[in-house]
Amino acid sequence: MDRTIKYQITEEADGLRIEQFLRHQGYSYQNITQLKKMPESILKNGVWEYMRSLLATGDILTVHIQENESSPNIPPVELPLSIIYEDEDILVVNKPAGMPIHPSLNNYENSLANGLMWYYTEQGKPFIFRCTNRLDRDTSGLTVIAKHLISSSILSSMGARHEIKREYLAIVRGSVTPPSGTIDAPLARTGSSMIERKVDFKHGERAVTHYKVVEEKNGHSLVSLILETGRTHQIRVHMQYLGFPLVGDYLYNPDMEYIHRQALHSWKLSFIHPITREPMEFTAELPKDMKNILI
């Protein structure tokens, strides 16, 4: 996928080398190496330049990203997609429950990656699948996809610095006590399982979840959760640890009376745009299967 980004050089960047300026914009060393291999990827005032060239106030720096290949081993499959937002750099999707993010041995043609590969193949565009905030197969809600190597790198760095804010909604049985708080409990694998996690204060990695009850209806509580860290199954294990596991969670609480998947939805996503640096915020309402529990 091709993308052209232009920067007007201000006094603050006067005298910097091009590579220094790009590093200040969030480009990684790997990004700069990748750009060097692309033909005419760096132009200053319309003329090709080396990365070590100096910039002056008023210069126009043009970065031309050229990615002509698609992700291998992701067959394009026409699948329903709820695209909330799209521009030249990112894509925000409201993923349904039951759809994996990536293809796997048992889910080779029903993943979000398959659907997006079809979406771009139909447009005649190459596409490399780069998902920034991954969701479990049975967790619904918002996820952001980077459309090229620069936005991917910047979003990944933002995620590592906890600058991508995610808020979830979950449903549990009963009245949660206390109704708000912070769960600070490290997580580790359960035995030899590659999937299941548990609270483990001796061997676990630090995990922090902030929660607050939003409403109580029909014997259940709707809980808002904000992640400070992003461990595997963090919300699911932390709520179990609190004594209020998510309903429908086959792994940690197989309570399938009202729903047949964990009642967990990524409803709000906010971050600074990786290229324009504008604040972005997206929301996705609670899906019907979760709403029905509260009726």
Each model region followed by its residue ranges:
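Pseudouridine synthases involved in rRNA/tRNA modification
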Residues: M1-K36, F201-K202, E215-N218, E228-T232, ...
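RNA pseudouridine synthases
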Residues: M1-S180, A188-G191, D289-I293
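Short, surface-exposed secondary-structure edge patches
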Residues: Y50-L54, S224, R261
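Short Pro/Gly-enriched beta-strand edge/turn motifs at strand-loop
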Residues: V63-Q66, S192-I195, R206, D249-D255
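Short coil-to-beta-strand transition motifs
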Residues: P75-E78, D200-T209, A263-L264
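Conserved hydrophobic positions within beta-strands
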Residues: I83, V172, H210-V213, L246
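Well-ordered beta-strand positions
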Residues: I84-Y85, D136, A188, K212-E215, ...
